[in-house]
Amino acid sequence: MPRLSTFSIAAFDPDDGAWGVAVASKFPAVGAVVPWAKSGAGAVATQAMGNTSFGARGLEMMAAGRSAQETLDALLADDVGREHRQVGAVDAAGQAATFTGKECLAWAGGRTGEHFAIQGNILTGPEVVDAMAQAFRLDSGDLADRLMAALLAGDRAGGDRRGRQSAALFVVKPQAGYGGFNDIWLDYRVDDDPDPVPRLVELLAIHRLYFGKSPADDQIPIAGEVATQLQRIMASLGYYGGPVSGAYDETTRSALTAFIGNENFEDRTDFAAGQIDRPVFDYLLRKFGG
């Protein structure tokens, strides 16, 4: 069985009630193996010659009230391959634990801190996990931002000494899934790419673009130059056949409704009030020109 030469972070955000894992590896589709998380239970990262049963079993144990350390102790107690395993966990209370078996290939090791467990194997050196820990502590964003800051810091510090191939971000919090029907807030994977961590950063930005919402002071009126640029874009794409006047009239509104609908930004455009979220407008300009 190939080893998952990997660096990962499992973490908890008590303010948001979120648990998650970010991971990168010189191995394809690392997101299918390493990250596990369950709202109200915790998060697990299982790697090296990873025992994938540690994911579901570990979450079940922590959901039943075991701490992260108690969970790792129980998982490893009867595992004949324990010295080839590397695993980190953060429990329902945010307590963290990490384990690196003696047979994991160098450099291998981990760090724990308040609400996080970091671990890696076949790394360029301990500077990778140290950089990850510092980045997680210093970032002031939400859990997804902090996880990605840590992963990017580890990647920039050297990461997997064999190279780069895949990365993943998995985050859960209560009713954060699409439509509020489950707890999966973020589940993004870059399965085979020469530079997967920056690509994963881009995917998180895309998620925020489509599912975010701007504050009132970042919503701009569709009038004047904004309307003119949108009319030009829509005319070039065949949505709009009227004059490029800068007026938000009924013809423009009808065309914009169709255009924005096809681009999936209905929730970030107020057609009745004639307003659009600035990040969406900026994105449309970059994508289509103005």
Language model feature labels by segment:
Residues 1-2, 290:
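Basic/polar N-terminal segments that are highly enriched at the extreme N-terminus
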